């Protein structure tokens, strides 16, 4: 990557970080760790 500009490298790094955080969020929302999450709307008495 010696011929590419610093701006392109920075843009790729930011893109990879954002995709990683998005993947982590989806994994935490729907993966095995989601079994322990509670829905406060289900526990609320009307």
UniProtKB/Swiss-Prot annotation:
Role summary: May play a role in photosystem I and II biogenesis.
Claim: Nucleotide-binding is one of the keywords in the record: no
Membrane topology: Single-pass membrane protein
UniProt record, GO biological process: photosynthesis
Family the UniProt entry places it in: Belongs to the PsbN family.
Transmembrane segments: 10-30
UniProt entry keywords in alphabetical sequence: Membrane, Thylakoid, Transmembrane, Transmembrane helix
Predominant location category: membrane
Entry protein name: Protein PsbN
Subcellular location: Cellular thylakoid membrane
NCBIfam families in the cross-refs: PRK13183.1
GO terms for cellular component: plasma membrane-derived thylakoid membrane
Organism of derivation: Prochlorococcus marinus (strain MIT 9211)
Gene it is expressed from: psbN
């Amino acid at each position: 990557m010696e011929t590419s500009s610093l701006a392109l490298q920075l843009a790729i790094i930011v893109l990879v970080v954002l995709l990683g955080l998005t993947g982590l969020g989806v994994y935490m929302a729907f993966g095995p760790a989601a079994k322990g999450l509670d829905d406060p709307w289900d526990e609320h008495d009307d």
